């Protein structure tokens, strides 16, 4: 969820009080678990204060921060061009946001590698059905790996291929985690990362490779982007989610929320996904809205 957006964009302040209550219900139930910056129009610390006071007032707790586009309140100053952790900047808010409870931040890092928290492998990126495009994607990922091993800060997360890494925000005392997301589409991390195109991502090829590697994945996607004039998922997307559900119900893939997965790995930092017992999680039941 985000707060300050232009007219026509769904956000907390742009909707009705009835819909805001629905948002709060979904935060409390755990279905909405990420703060997606404070929005495109949030340019000052005061905007952050207003949003955090609203969340606090209604008992809504979020632990995950996800940078959005190039919003001023983003934490990532390189890819996402944010200023949220720059003391002295009008958009600085890191101290307030961390005090509120944010523990995990995403600052724009995305990989094409299928499966994290297992050894780095570029196998599965190249696809002979889309040879030229997939080889281009493979070359980009190889470049990230080389730069990461040369100490390039932008790609620090890529070399170990771990979902989480301890991080300190620039100019702030925040001791938390930065996390890595993945989009395994053959044409690169910015392809079909939408509700319209996710059917081209959640393929049998990807799911089989993920299960074979026994890895983890926080998928990079924007499910609300359905294409011009569309209000529902298309048939390809529906079939993709049914496919994922089949893998879940057959015990091959654990499907969970971002916050739950990050909590799991932060509590088991030194081991791989196959080395620890999965916790007992209360079933997420969609609330009556």
Annotated model-derived regions:
Residues 1-184, 197-220, 228-289:
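Catalytic alpha-helical scaffold of carbohydrate-active enzymes acting on polysaccharides/glycoconjugates
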């Amino acid at each position: 969820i985000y707060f300050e957006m232009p007219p026509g964009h769904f956000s907390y302040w742009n909707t009705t009080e009835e819909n805001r209550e629905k948002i709060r219900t979904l935060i409390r139930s755990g279905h909405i678990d990420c703060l997606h910056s404070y929005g495109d129009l949030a340019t000052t610390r005061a905007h952050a204060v207003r949003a955090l006071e609203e969340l606090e007032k209604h008992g809504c707790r979020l632990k995950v921060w996800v940078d959005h586009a190039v919003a001023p309140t983003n934490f990532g100053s390189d890819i996402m061009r944010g200023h949220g952790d720059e003391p002295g900047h009008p958009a600085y808010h890191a101290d307030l946001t961390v005090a509120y409870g944010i523990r995990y931040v995403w600052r724009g890092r995305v990989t094409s590698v299928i499966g994290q928290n297992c050894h780095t492998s570029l196998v599965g990126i190249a696809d002979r059905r889309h040879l030229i495009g997939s080889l281009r994607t493979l070359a980009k990922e190889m470049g990230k790996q080389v730069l990461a091993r040369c100490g390039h800060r932008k790609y620090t997360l890529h070399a170990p291929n771990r979902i989480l890494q301890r991080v300190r925000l620039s100019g702030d005392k925040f001791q938390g985690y930065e996390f890595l997301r993945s989009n395994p589409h053959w044409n690169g991390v910015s392809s079909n990362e939408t509700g319209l195109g996710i059917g081209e991502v959640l393929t049998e090829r990807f799911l089989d490779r993920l299960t074979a590697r026994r890895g983890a994945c926080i998928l990079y996607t924007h499910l609300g982007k359905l294409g011009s004039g569309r209000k529902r998922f298309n048939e390809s997307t529906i079939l993709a989610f049914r496919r994922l559900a089949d893998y879940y119900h057959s015990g091959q893939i654990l499907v969970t929320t971002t916050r739950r997965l990050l909590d799991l790995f932060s509590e088991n930092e030194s081991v791989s996904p196959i080395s620890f017992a999965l916790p007992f999680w209360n079933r997420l039941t969609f609330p009556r809205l």
